[in-house]
Design a protein with these regions (language model features):
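Extended alpha-helical scaffold and adjacent linker segments that couple domains
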Residues: 1-245
Length: 245
């Protein structure tokens, strides 16, 4: 018998996903990433966690260690001292708002996303949002049972991929410090990478402890040695002014 073929005039599900992903606004992608970042929880040794601050005013100036997760648009590239992440971190470190210098600058650490990995993450988010829109429009798209199953499976996979790649993308720990042997007035930066499958905050906390960027407890003798190196470096006495009567 003669074989018969027929063609479905509807676009394939994958074609619909690709088309929708290309039409998703950048602002929607950033909003989805920030929404997921805001699910991060504060962990010791940090007294505060500040996620995607809109300005330096959003980060308190207090005597307690704080971790700042920079916005998805404030990315970092290896060895680039003027990256968007560094520009944002320096602003928060130096200021509390537009007119107030920050006092407790030694209480802040920052985590930034890698520029290249962020580009990949944004594509993952576009696919996730595209699958989500298809699930929301499944009735108007007249999806059959097989297509509904494919949509649900693909949406779950896309969701998990975004979560995993979000943890990978936020891989730069920006640590401000001063070199006591050089110029104590000039802030310098260490920028180690933090990797692993743990949460962004957990990875940052472990690295901060390992590198002694944050020291929750310090032995009295070690503190004395550190103070001695500053107090008696160039003199064997300290001047004391007479009290005013």
């Amino acid at each position: 018998s003669r074989s018969r073929y027929w063609y479905d005039t509807r676009p394939t599900l994958r074609k619909t996903v690709t088309d929708r992903a290309s039409q998703i606004a950048d602002a929607d992608v950033v909003r989805e990433i920030e929404t997921r970042l805001r699910k991060c929880k504060k962990e010791s040794p940090f007294a505060g966690l500040h996620i995607c601050p809109a300005s330096s005013l959003d980060v308190p100036d207090e005597q307690a260690a704080r971790l700042v997760l920079l916005r998805p648009t404030e990315t970092h590239t290896v060895n680039k001292v003027d990256s968007a992440a560094m520009t944002a971190a320096v602003d928060v470190l130096n200021n509390r708002g537009s007119n107030t210098p920050r006092i407790y600058r030694n209480m802040l650490l920052f985590v930034a996303a890698d520029a290249g990995l962020m580009n990949d993450l944004q594509q993952d988010v576009r696919l996730y949002l595209a699958w989500q829109s298809i699930q929301n429009d499944r009735e108007s798209l007249n999806l059959d049972a097989a297509q509904n199953r494919e949509t649900e499976s693909s949406l779950r996979a896309a969701h998990d991929t975004v979560d995993a790649h979000l943890r990978e993308a936020y891989c730069w720990l920006l640590i401000p410090y001063v070199d006591k042997a050089a110029d104590v007035k000039t802030v310098q930066w260490e920028m180690p990478r933090i990797g692993g499958d743990e949460s962004i905050v957990t990875k940052a906390a472990k690295k901060a402890r390992t590198d002694e960027a944050v020291i929750p407890r310090w032995a009295p003798m070690l503190l004395k040695m550190e103070l001695d190196s500053l107090l008696w470096a160039s003199s064997d006495h300290l001047p004391v002014s007479a009290p005013c009567l």
